[in-house]
From Swiss-Prot:
The gene is LB3. Residues 2-147 form the Globin domain. Leghemoglobin that reversibly binds oxygen O(2) through a pentacoordinated heme iron. In root nodules, facilitates the diffusion of oxygen to the bacteroids while preventing the bacterial nitrogenase from being inactivated by buffering dioxygen, nitric oxide and carbon monoxide, and promoting the formation of reactive oxygen species (ROS, e.g. H(2)O(2)). This role is essential for symbiotic nitrogen fixation (SNF). This is Leghemoglobin. It is found in: Cytoplasm, Cytosol; Nucleus. It comes from Medicago sativa. PROSITE patterns: GLOBIN, PLANT_GLOBIN. Keywords: Cytoplasm, Heme, Iron, Metal-binding, Nitration, Nitrogen fixation, Nodulation, Nucleus, Oxygen transport, Phosphoprotein, Transport. Coiled coil: none annotated.
Length: 147
């Protein structure tokens, strides 16, 4: 069974909830990543020289890009059943930063935790699954571009 219209709608509506507090959820997202993988701090240019996760335009822009790409992946999965990267350099950037498979798991967990925080009592298993499938599609496309 492919990605459904309901799943796409769930991702889109929760994406809007995320964007309503982009500064707060961006900090939450990167704080969650660094709690699970402190060594990943150096992979992010906007974090590597800071004492901790602090709000900045670069942090917000990167978080919005990550979550936006997952949202776009949901749209692509619904329309075509596959994710095609809009930025051909994503594979080489991830290689350059030293990204390996476990990092994708950490980011996925942080993404889900952030969306759960953003939607509050609207969180459901179906919402979680929708984001997981969309993220997995994006991660797969990035990994393919890395090989």
């Amino acid at each position: 069974m492919g990605f459904t219209a309901d799943q796409e709608a769930l991702v889109n509506s929760s994406w809007e909830s995320f964007k309503q507090n982009l500064p707060g959820y961006s900090v939450f997202f990167y704080t969650t990543i660094l709690e699970k993988a402190p060594a990943a701090k150096g992979m992010f240019s906007f974090l590597k020289d800071s004492a901790g996760v602090q709000d900045s335009p670069q942090l917000q822009a990167h978080a919005e890009k990550v979550f936006g790409m997952v949202r776009d992946s949901a749209v692509q999965l619904r329309a075509t059943g596959e994710v095609v990267l809009g930025d051909a350099t994503l594979g080489s950037i991830h290689i350059q930063k030293g990204v390996v498979d476990p990092h994708f798991v950490v980011v996925k967990e942080a993404l889900l935790k952030t969306i759960k925080e953003a939607v509050g009592d609207k969180w459901s298993e179906e919402l979680s699954t929708s984001w997981e499938v969309a993220y997995d599609g994006l991660a797969s496309a990035i990994k393919k571009a890395m090989s």
